[in-house]
């Protein structure tokens, strides 16, 4: 029976310890303090881990609108104490009328990303509300309506603007009103472009600017339209999002815009369903690692990187060794090459998941890695069961959010949620930002005359880097869970955190805070402001091309210790962890 305790009658005071906390009973962590508090409120009211995760997703819709929300989608892993690991795919879908030519210009060439992401055509059918409803049905203890209370209070009563929200408003405000804009990650801009001017996105400007000026950290924002919608969905169930007035508002937003109007229909919304998929699992140094199946590339790519590194003694090398980071960089680029060629929505393309994580295949790929010299060229391999594919890498903008809830019974809900780039498509419906997830498809439908696996197709879910992950010890007990935000860096952030925790024995807080190595078309990128840039000369001596830069990172994790679970947000973020 659903627990009917009033949410206002908290059984214990909120205990906030930043950036990590030890568990008394349940533990929650997210990238925003108000969302973390929402999760704790639900746990204190008798809610389950899944209930708390749903409440955090809803609260993040309000207070972290640049990163995620009900206008987007997500993936949830749920581990029942002494029970099965299950997953829910709430990834957005392309409208039924979408074709592979969606992002091809009049000249027959794929649009530049800066032109493709704003407006209606980039919006996928949102999945988070269906995901939330399925999670509450399967694992919930509280009634559906109760999960909305914290988010409704924030939307109607107001919330203070954080540094990341202010930065995103500053970066995107020129686009809303015309002129040039920086496409921002969680903490800043990553690329710049210019579009047609003249108040292109007035609804976003109305919500997230003041008198034409960007939001300022510390000022108070309310969102009564979103509060009203949340009340409606809370009272009437998930269909209130996918049908009726909200469906009309959403369809109007994406079809009536003068910026790339969409072909999405009310039927597309009404037909959307979240999907349960079997998890994808593998092993690393005796530990079991589990994550999402496609259309997430999380489990396959993370397991490939870890598998290629398993023959190297990373523990002996240590976190301060340039050789260790060289090896990680090599495995990363080989695994990402496979990702770009083979991964996509398995409802539309054959993805050789088993072959990609096959031990023999991974050993073959690992054999390409030298301890002393960069490979230089990182081509996809041919895993068992693979069909010929066309290689067409696609850009992802840093964004997204991750959060974790663990309840007193030991159930774990770990979820990554997104609208893709900051403020998604820049379109607003009933106070929530609409995603630009369809730009996660390959903008080029074919290459050298052959179709690309991740091309746009009607009803298809785009490939995703979201990678909620759970690590189990040799006895099968969960000991670590992690996920991240930041576009394609997510996969490397998760892998780095696992290596730091398992090989280098760092606690969750330090594992997340450790610097990151990534790559672009010009070579390796070392995260500035960390210990890694000091390794630039050593890596260059091994044959790498190396630059230093900001990467827009944001992760959350929880680890099991002798005294219970400990939650940790990324020290780069404004996130928190709370305990009961």
Stretches with model-predicted labels:
Residues 311-418, 570:
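Internal maturation/activation junctions in enzymes
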Residues 19-37, 41, 47-50, 54-236, ...:
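Noncatalytic scaffold domains of N-terminal-nucleophile
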Residues 290-299, 400-404, 414-426, 484-491:
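Glycine-rich phosphate/pyrophosphate-binding beta-alpha loops
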Residues 62-69, 75-87, 258-265, 411-475, ...:
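Active-site rim segments in enzyme catalytic domains, especially the processed small/beta chain
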Residues 6-16:
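Bacterial N-terminal signal peptides
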Residues 459-461, 494, 503-550:
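Extended C-terminal subregions enriched in glycine
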Residues 276, 397-400, 464-466:
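Short, small/polar residue-rich loop motifs at catalytic or cofactor-binding pockets
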